Every structure is written in structure tokens, then in C-alpha cells.
A protein has these predicted regions:
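Active-site-flanking structural segment that lines cofactor/substrate pockets
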Residues: 39-66
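Selected transmembrane alpha-helices and immediately adjacent juxtamembrane segments
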Residues: 1-31, 38, 111-212, 273-295
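Membrane-interfacial helix-loop connectors
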Residues: 58-114, 192-263
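Interfacial loop-to-transmembrane junctions
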Residues: 36, 260-279
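Short amphipathic alpha-helical segments
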Residues: 25-29, 41, 51, 67, ...
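Cytoplasmic-side transmembrane-helix entry/capping segments in multi-pass membrane proteins
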Residues: 45-46, 83-88, 270-275
Length: 295
């Protein structure tokens, strides 16, 4: 019981730290949705399939809010699948500030960010251009109608039909996601505390050549603790750099959790989750092959 209460408290505090940024993110979404419909239309009319570039750049910012925004926009079909994946793969959550605090790893951080951004853009373009004809139309994303039809959420009005302030809608969505993320954080915290970080390190070390595959799986956990764990294991020498890259590529912060909450198609969500994991694992294994051949 003591262990449960400790993890419960830590999960609550860690998740609560996300609330201000999540609220601002949702407030931005509501503001854009209600006040800038024409600008959205003009932006989308300019060619949304190139969105992988700004998506990857925004993903570099160590904040979970951008992946949450991307998930909401994809659920509303405002952005393409390629843009969504670019944001996910470029996101590094808490790994960046953690590595920034260690001057000895600044060179590795620079290499990490370059690899992630380039790879995120490449995957995004592959999905939006090369594989566009193969993917089902409902999965491609991207909005081609009129901006006044873009609705990331529902109409914000009371029973009398009066418009509600955007902050109320933003607050409600923030609290809904808070509960969802808190549940994930609690379960993950109990697993880590119950099994132990050493067990995770031993498991990753025993995987050998396929370590990136497992690291990519760990990265899928929608909690900043996952990116912190991967970074700490790398710093401690239990994780190879290729595995760190794989794990941080799949570490889209709360993006996947928000996607599962907002996108109604569980099949699409499952495919995107698997695609995120596969993209990270493939990159990690490919890096290991290159190192093995040329090192």
C-alpha cells in the first residue's frame, strides 16, 4: 500500500506539471478554431503535404503540447499523416533538457537532433508523397474542404445555444486528457517501482543487436518518465546510442495518448502506434548495422 501511495503521489505531481502547458495548447487550438478559420483555410490551401518540415521543427521543442496539438489536428483531419508522424518522430520530450544539463553529451545531443529531424521529414514525405496512393484515403489525413468546417472538437454552446468562452472548452479538454495521462503514468510508475530500473537495464542489455526494438517499445509509453529512463540508461552505459535514438523517436510524449482519446477509429490509432514503433525500431537497427559494418 505504501508503494502504491508513493507512486500515486508522484504520478499526480508529474502529470499536474503538464497542466499549464496542456491548457495553453488547448486554448490555442480553441482560439485558432474559432477566430482564425480563414487563415487556416489559406494555410491548408497552400499545400498541407509539406507540413512534415514545420512539424519536425516544432517537434524539436521539448514540450509535450506540440504532439498533443498535432494529434488533435490529425483527428480533425487538419494535417496529414506525414505531418503527424514528423511531429511524433522529432519529439524528444524531457530528453533534451536532461542532455543539455550534461555538457559532456552536447555533441551527442546535436547528432541526435539532426538525425531525428532529418528522419522525421523523410518519413513524413514518404507517407504524404511516395506512399500516398497506397494508404487508405481515411488514413491520409489532410483537410481539403472549407475552413469553417474544421472542428477539432464540438460546438461550444450551452443548452440555450449561447456561445461558451473558449477557455471553458479548453479547460474541459485539458482535464479529460489529464485523467487519461494520469492513468498511464500510474500504471507505468507501478511497473517501474515493482520491477525495478535495474531489470529494465538488464533486459535491454540482453537484447543485443535487437536492443533498439525494445527501446522503441519503451519509448511508446506516453509519459516523460520513459524518455528520462531511456536517457539515464544511455548515460549509464546500459543503452547504445542507436537504441536511444530509436526510443526517443517513438517517444512522442502524450501525443499518442491524445490520439487514442480524440481519434474515433481504433484501427487507425493502432496502425499509427505500430507505425511509430516500427519507424523508430527500423532506424535504430539500421544505425546498428551501419556501426557494425563501418566501425
Amino acid at each position: 500500500m505504501e508503494l502504491f501511495l508513493d507512486v500515486l503521489g508522484e504520478s499526480l505531481v508529474d502529470t499536474a506539471k503538464m497542466l499549464p502547458f496542456l491548457f495553453l495548447a488547448y486554448l490555442l487550438i480553441e482560439y485558432i478554431e474559432t477566430r482564425h478559420g480563414e487563415r487556416i483555410e489559406a494555410l491548408l490551401a497552400g499545400g498541407g503535404r509539406w507540413g512534415a518540415i514545420p512539424g519536425a521543427v516544432l517537434g524539436c521543442v521539448p514540450q509535450c503540447g506540440f504532439s498533443a496539438i498535432a494529434s488533435n489536428f490529425y483527428s480533425s483531419r487538419v494535417i496529414t499523416l506525414g505531418t503527424l508522424m514528423a511531429v511524433y518522430l522529432a519529439t524528444s520530450d524531457e530528453a533534451i533538457p536532461l542532455l543539455v544539463s550534461m555538457p559532456a553529451y552536447w555533441d551527442k545531443l546535436a547528432v541526435l537532433m539532426v538525425i531525428k529531424v532529418v528522419y522525421a521529414i523523410a518519413v513524413g514525405f514518404a507517407l504524404d508523397f511516395v506512399l500516398r496512393g497506397v494508404l487508405p484515403k481515411s488514413l491520409r489525413g489532410g483537410y481539403t474542404g472549407h475552413a469553417d468546417e474544421v472542428d477539432c472538437h464540438e460546438e461550444h454552446s450551452d443548452e440555450a445555444g449561447n456561445a461558451q468562452p473558449i477557455w471553458k472548452a479548453a479547460l474541459r479538454h485539458t482535464l479529460e486528457i489529464f485523467v487519461f495521462i494520469f492513468a498511464f503514468s500510474l500504471v507505468f510508475g507501478l511497473i517501474v517501482e515493482g520491477v525495478g530500473e535495474d531489470v529494465f537495464a538488464d533486459l535491454l542489455g540482453s537484447m543485443g543487436f535487437f536492443q533498439p526494438v525494445v527501446a522503441a517499445l519503451v519509448g511508446l509509453i506516453p509519459n516523460c518518465a520513459a524518455s528520462v529512463l531511456l536517457t539515464q540508461l544511455y548515460v549509464e552505459g546500459a543503452l547504445r546510442f542507436s537504441s536511444l535514438v530509436a526510443g526517443l523517436c517513438t517517444g512522442a510524449g502524450v501525443g499518442l495518448a491524445v490520439l487514442w482519446r480524440t481519434n474515433p477509429s481504433w484501427k487507425q490509432n493502432l496502425f499509427i502506434t505500430g507505425l511509430t514503433w516500427g519507424a523508430g525500431a527500423v532506424l535504430g537497427v539500421a544505425m546498428q548495422v551501419v556501426v557494425a559494418v563501418f566501425a
